[in-house]
């Protein structure tokens, strides 16, 4: 359940995250492998939801909850990435998440990757809410709607 104390919090608390590049995230050339940006995006989104106050088990299937027990599923229907500079082991980056609700059943997550204040990459990932049993579009959950609304506040 979402704590009401969040009403007074700054969205930066759950939308701006920091990470360090690890050896296992690099390729044979010693730079971050391209797919890592998408993995980091999903991890950033998950961490953002948790910091906001949404339990991941309420959004994603777990070993205790399968997809059919959830009210909605949020598959990715479009994603794209731009890479402006390589990243290496030990680089510290900031990941900034911006949200945009498209309509009652979809939203876009936009991520900016910054190193030393300079943008070095970006991604856009569009999700659509579907009924996990019928696989048809449906309205976003109350929790996700609230997170999107409060996350879209200028910070």
UniProtKB/Swiss-Prot annotation:
EC no.?
3.1.2.28
Pathway membership, UniProt: Cofactor biosynthesis; phylloquinone biosynthesis; Quinol/quinone metabolism; 1,4-dihydroxy-2-naphthoate biosynthesis; 1,4-dihydroxy-2-naphthoate from chorismate: step 7/7
Q: Which domain of life is it from?
A: Bacteria
Q: Which reaction does it catalyse?
A: 1,4-dihydroxy-2-naphthoyl-CoA + H2O = 1,4-dihydroxy-2-naphthoate + CoA + H(+)
Any one GO molecular function term: 1,4-dihydroxy-2-naphthoyl-CoA thioesterase activity
Active site: residue positions? 27
The job of this chain, per UniProt, is described as: Catalyzes the hydrolysis of 1,4-dihydroxy-2-naphthoyl-CoA (DHNA-CoA) to 1,4-dihydroxy-2-naphthoate (DHNA), a reaction involved in phylloquinone (vitamin K1) biosynthesis.
This chain belongs to the protein called 1,4-dihydroxy-2-naphthoyl-CoA hydrolase
Upper lineage is: Bacteria, Bacillati, Cyanobacteriota, Cyanophyceae, Synechococcales
